[in-house]
Each structure stands twice: as structure tokens, then as C-alpha cells.
């Protein structure tokens, strides 16, 4: 996306909201029926508080027009059109059906009106005075920056200056900023001032997910898609914890969700907590498995990459580019994302626990939220877990990893047979099981998910089935480690008689 002259500064995008389907919590007033034309529509029409039309042009693409219903943040309807985004809101039946929008044209230098000599004579002294004032302000700014450098802020201001300069020149920024994203720890989050700059340039495009703890939106930053997780006010501790971990721990890894920025913003007189990360259009592994059946080689690709991510979290890396050991504490298929290359990456570190052998300090954080009951290990359900022992938290991750393996195996085709997607323990607990429901099944009855007999007919899935059993040992210390799971899966993928995992 070309931003034009450096004098134009940073482009600030405003977008209207387009929701999918019928609203859950509409605004006040009667609902209207609207034409719905977007990738997330459930039908040709939807019902909402008002109708919307959004015209957006992303980098390297033709403008695309989306129609749908609006329910939240009506104030965004008053945004002015730009050369990249235009939107329209209305309140009557199917009022957005025949509406067509155009983007604001960029005025070329040849179209700009000239100034005559008399105007130049008048403006000359004024511009000279403004230049002197600007020089004075620049001098004061240099003095201020020198003072801030002494307080340890020089590096952050330098990074912020670089991002502003690059934005003015129209460079592709996201790849440049995150160029250090590699398979080993190579840097924590961006400097705080850069994060705030990035966060305030993001325009929300569409809501792609909702949960008890907030919403996930696809946003645009300089024409590139990013994911914006907006935390609800009651889950502030999860936002704070995840921000803290990303900004203090060297977590760059192919199989850990890439962090971009975190910021506390004000929208419509209310505070919003944003976490901005890489965007993966396939969504979570939970969503992917519901709509996609797997060949054995793809199932192995997903499991190997998920194991690599978990092993990277669990291991402590020493040295200047090191990291403490981290236990996830809420590992599940909804918190694993599927990338465009069909590898997995682990997300949601809001409950993570950190431990460093050097200081022997266990950093549990201060979050009242608990993990997902369906994926809780037996020692958590019967409250026998040693909360002062870091290994205990890693063992609970392994139990949950075995359940995710089971979800993948059910959706893998063997001899033309495959089961529908089901969550773990679907046949013995309700859709939203209580703590007592899970405790009875897992601790009292000592049940584990039933492994289909057909898995024994495939060399890959038979290995996965055995691995599941070793992840579900009642004795936590007897379970496999994440590193052993990773190496075993890699050995299966590299075995000549097994299907190869395509790299």
C-alpha cells in the first residue's frame, strides 16, 4: 500500500462493523432485516440493529464490498471515507441492498491548485516564521530525548522514530518489524512505544470469533491482516499476563502465535484491552477439524508442529537469548491455531506459569481464571496437584495434549472411514460440563476417551494411539514429556515406511 508524500504522516483507518448472522446482544430499538454478503454470512440476509455496507481495499487487491448487520459501536458509522475504506449505515428494511460506495480519490500533484505571486509574497514570511518555530520545537525535542535516554528510554524512542519514517515512505512494515521471527528465541515483544503506535493504526474489519473472555477480530494494519483479541473487562488479568509474558520472554518460534503489539485503548468512552498477533485465516484447530477431514500425513503434520510448540514452551533455554520454562495451563484445540502452511501454533498464554532454575522462582501470576474443565487432568480435578512444583503444571499440559491428539485422530481417514468431530468425553458429560461432572468421569470412574479400533490399521495412527495412552497415565510423573513426544513424532514422520510430513 502506497502512502504518498511523507508530509501526509501516518494513515489512520476507520472501519464500520459487519457482523455475521443474527445478533446476540443487539442495540436498543427494533431489529431490521439486511442484505448479507460477506464470507461469514449464514444466508442472504441477517438481522441486526442497523444495516451496513463496507468498501475496503487491501494491499495488492481490488476493492471489495461487504454487506451485513451492525450491532455494536455505532459511533464508527460516522467515520469519513478514505482512499482505502468507505462505509454506510442505514436503519430500514433491506436498505443496504442497492447501495454502492466509492473510495475517496487521491489528488495528484497536477490537480493541486497553483498559487499566484501575490499569495506567495503573503505566505513567505508566515512560512519562514513557522519554520523557525519548528526548528525551536525540534531543538527542544532533541534535549528531551537526551534526557529520556538517560532514563533508559532511548532505544524505544529510536524504534518509534524508525517506524514513523518507514510508514511515511510506504514500506511493507509488518514483515520488517517481525523479521526476527524464527524457530528459536530471538527477541521478545516490540518496544512499548512502537506497540502503541502499531495498535492505534489498526482498523477493525470483521469479528471472527467470540468467547467468554472477549472477541477476536481481523484487523488491517497498512493493508496487512492482523488478529486483534479484545479482552472483556473481567478478564483484564489474562490480558495483563499474556502481555507480560510476550514482553519479557523470548518467545519467537514458528509454532507459537506471533505477537505484534498490546495496548489499552479507549473506544466509545470505554476502555478496551487489545492484543495484536499474526492472523491465521484457518482459525483454531477446533474450527479446522469440524470442517476438514485429514489424511494421515496431514494429521502427523499437525501433531508434530503442535508438539514442537509445546516443547519450546516447556524447555528452559539458557544464555542471553534464553527463556524460562513455561507451562501453558489451558492447552486445548481452541487455543491451537492452524497456519496457512497447515502447521499448528499455540496461542492464549493468559494462564501460563514461568519457572527459572537459576532463581528457582515459580511465577504463577495473579489470575483468578481457571483452565477449561473438559481438558483438566485428574490431579487438578481432585485438587491433588502440587501448586508449588513447576513440573506439575507441565504434566497437566501433557494430559491435555493427549486429548488434542485424540481429536485429530478421530478426523483422520483410515480405509475410507472417519468419525465426525466431537470434543473429548462428549459421550459421558454435557456440552458445558461442571467441575463435578468431570471429576466423576476422570477421577472416580477413571475414564479416558475411547480410542477407535480402526487406528490400529494405520502405522501412523497406531503410534498416535499409543502416545495418547502414555499421555493419560493417572500418575502424572509417568506421562511422556513434551520433548519425548516431539522426538517420537518426528521419528514417525521420518520413517521410510510412514507417510512423509511435507515441509
From Swiss-Prot:
Protein's GO biological process: angiogenesis; heart development; regulation of multicellular organismal process; transforming growth factor beta receptor signaling pathway
Domain Protein kinase residue range list: 202-492
Region (Mediates specificity for BMP ligand): 73-76
Residue ranges annotated as Cytoplasmic topological domain: 142-503
Membrane-related topology note: Single-pass type I membrane protein
Pfam family membership, one: TGF_beta_GS
Residues the record lists as binding ATP: 208-216, 229
Function: Type I receptor for TGF-beta family ligands BMP9/GDF2 and BMP10 and important regulator of normal blood vessel development. On ligand binding, forms a receptor complex consisting of two type II and two type I transmembrane serine/threonine kinases. Type II receptors phosphorylate and activate type I receptors which autophosphorylate, then bind and activate SMAD transcriptional regulators. May bind activin as well.
Name of protein: Activin receptor type-1-like
